[in-house]
């Protein structure tokens, strides 16, 4: 997992890494933006746990330390059978460790992908547990704000567990008007009022997300599917969706009350639990999930490797990249203005491998003036071969993000060197090389640059 000898608080036991004398670290379960998750054994109790390892340097560099602190504070506040339990928090000079309940059935999202959609009685089982967890959070003044199938895990018995409170808010975060004002969430699941910048009720916003999850469980697709995020939110604000014909009458009556664009008239939890669909007795429970032993041979952990796919970018990170609040130029190939720093920010349907090939080609055609110093699914970094002027070598970073199926956003920015040289490089070399893969460029005969 880590360079144990160099990391304070870690040691060795029987060939495996031991964290602060308490947890014997096992295999890597998954990777995140700021670290990874390991299965581990609590040496005091013998139980298996999940240990989330967070690299402080990455968190600080991304300006996310407050989010990590908030996630820890919230998880200490909520203890519920359908919420992943936080056992312990530890820290060293360079890392934060969260010992969590080990939930081994995988994401609910994975089950939806495999099955296409879920039987109505199974969906009711999951949905009841979701609502129970969400209602408990609200009773403790906690609003999740990023509810989606990827943040819902299943245990071996098929029971649901809510995770990832990194975007959650506490009731005391509300302003004088009693509303929350932070833009956050995931495209397709965030309530339309969250984007209006006039404040929103965290509980009602969570219920909208629950409604989207219920729709996805029953229909096997999103109610507002659209690659263009702007169009997606317009559909959500109009309530522009259709319930599949195979849904029961009670389900077809419930979903519009959850996906009500008006938060004032949207159904509350108290009303929801009294609806016929919610109260109906399920015919059967979801079957248990057969899994391998929780703690397999604790192989020496490897250093974190970069994912082989672009990082997922949610709508609000996308807004933070855009100048102003208008996302449409990203999806329309609008080239008139360019970005203030002379760089590029554009959407494309080109796969990550194609974008990378174009960027590497720029360096190859430059006669050795630029070289590739980093290349992967998350982006490419080009650096000048010559020392450069007083500000050093020119360095250009192109980060690649996924915002929807088959849609990427590429953010090109200066990573070092002289600004005038950077602008010239973007204008004369980068932009012509990337022009025909910018969304909307193929249909527009005018030169296409970035937002």
UniProtKB/Swiss-Prot annotation:
CDD domains: CIPK_C (cd12195). ATP binds at residues 29-37, 52. Its EC number is 2.7.11.1. It comes from the Eukaryota. One of its GO terms (biological process) is signal transduction. It catalyses: L-seryl-[protein] + ATP = O-phospho-L-seryl-[protein] + ADP + H(+); L-threonyl-[protein] + ATP = O-phospho-L-threonyl-[protein] + ADP + H(+). Its cofactor is Mn(2+). Keywords: ATP-binding, Kinase, Manganese, Nucleotide-binding, Serine/threonine-protein kinase, Transferase. It is an enzyme of class 2 (transferase). The keyword Magnesium does not apply. It holds the Pfam family Pkinase. Residues 308-332 form the NAF domain. The activation loop within the kinase domain is the target of phosphorylation/activation by upstream protein kinases. The PPI motif mediates the interaction with the ABI (abscisic acid-insensitive) phosphatases. Belongs to the protein kinase superfamily. CAMK Ser/Thr protein kinase family. SNF1 subfamily. This is CBL-interacting protein kinase 6.
